[in-house]
Each structure stands twice: as structure tokens, then as C-alpha cells.
Amino acid sequence: MANTTGKKIKDAAIIGGCASLIYLTIGDISYRLSLSRGGLNSKLITDMVAKSAAKKPKNEYKEKLDSMIDDGADWFMHQDTEKIIIEKKHRQSLYADLIRPDKPSNVYIICIHGYTSSPANMGIYAKKYHELGYNVLLPSLRGHGDSEQDFITMGWNDRLDVIEWINYIAERHPESKIILHGVSMVLQPP
């Protein structure tokens, strides 16, 4: 009797261990696919999405929006941006592009991109702010663009980075007015 109880416990432990291993493996694959640079940000995935989108029925609104985003990204790529780096001693440095207006201004817009995006994709907004005569700072969030981090933090650590950028501007330009503009996962209330 004791022998069969011991066997049942052993079998249950083996099954539980295997189930846990499968669960952890699936979780790790999902995490790496959705939150790493090689996941949804990879060229393979973006090419697959583009091919899939090409097969879908035309949507005038989406086509117009995509065209505007592409125009903004093209504008951004042709700007003379100043590369800003906040060096960190014990963690990855922060990176951003700064586009200065034609005439000096004390207004700074921090334009923050969203999930699987980049500062260039915020060009649609940066262009308008630049035309209005504002300084535009476009940070690369963690796991995106110039960022040193390999994984996306879905805004959790990025919120602290935004505070760093605000402090960066305020320390150098105490009279500045700072406006935050973000899409997707950023600027969520704490």
C-alpha cells in the first residue's frame, strides 16, 4: 500500500515538474517574442506584418495615417538632430534626439514614441512642433532605437527615464517650459 502511495506521489511530482517546465518555456518564449528587440521589433516580423496588411482590403483612413507617419519619419531623418546622451554609472545610458527650432525658444516638447516604435515615427508630431518654433526632444525608450537595453519595459522603467529627461532640460534651461507628448504605453498615471 505504502509502495503505491509513494509511486503516485512520484508520478504526480514528475507530471507537475514537466507541466511547470512547459509553462515556464512558453512564458519565456512569449516574453522574448513580445518584449525583446529580436521579437516583434525584428525585420522578419515587420515584413510578415507588411505582407499580411497588403492582403487585407484597403482602408482609406489607415492608408492616409500610414502615409502621414511615413512623411513624418522621412522629415525626421532629414533633420540636423543633436544626439543627447545621459550617462549612467550603474545602468544603461539614455539616448535622445533633439531638434532645435530656427529661432531660440524656451519651450521643450518631449515627444515619446510607443511600443515597437521609434523617435522617427514621432516625426509626424515633431515636425508640427518644430514649425511652431519649439525644441523637440525625442528619446529612444528602453528596447527601442538607440537604447542599450535589449528588452522593452512597457513604460514601467521608461516613466523614470522621462523624469530624467525633464530634469536634464530643467537643469540646463531653468526658465524652460516642458510639455510631454506620448503615444501608446507612455505617460500612464502612476
Residue ranges with predicted function:
Residues 126-148:
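Conserved alpha/beta-hydrolase
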Residues 89-100:
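A short loop-to-beta-strand scaffold at the N-terminal edge of the catalytic core in hydrolase folds
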Residues 189-190:
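Hydrolases whose catalytic domains are alpha/beta-hydrolase-1, hotdog thioesterase
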Residues 114-124, 136:
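Serine-hydrolase catalytic-loop signature spanning alpha/beta hydrolases and amidase-signature enzymes
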Residues 152-173:
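Alpha/beta-hydrolase active-site loop
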Residues 173-184:
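Alpha/beta-hydrolase fold nucleophile elbow
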Residues 13-86:
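An N-terminal hydrophobic leader/cap segment in hydrolases
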Residues 106-114:
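Short beta-strand element of the alpha/beta-hydrolase
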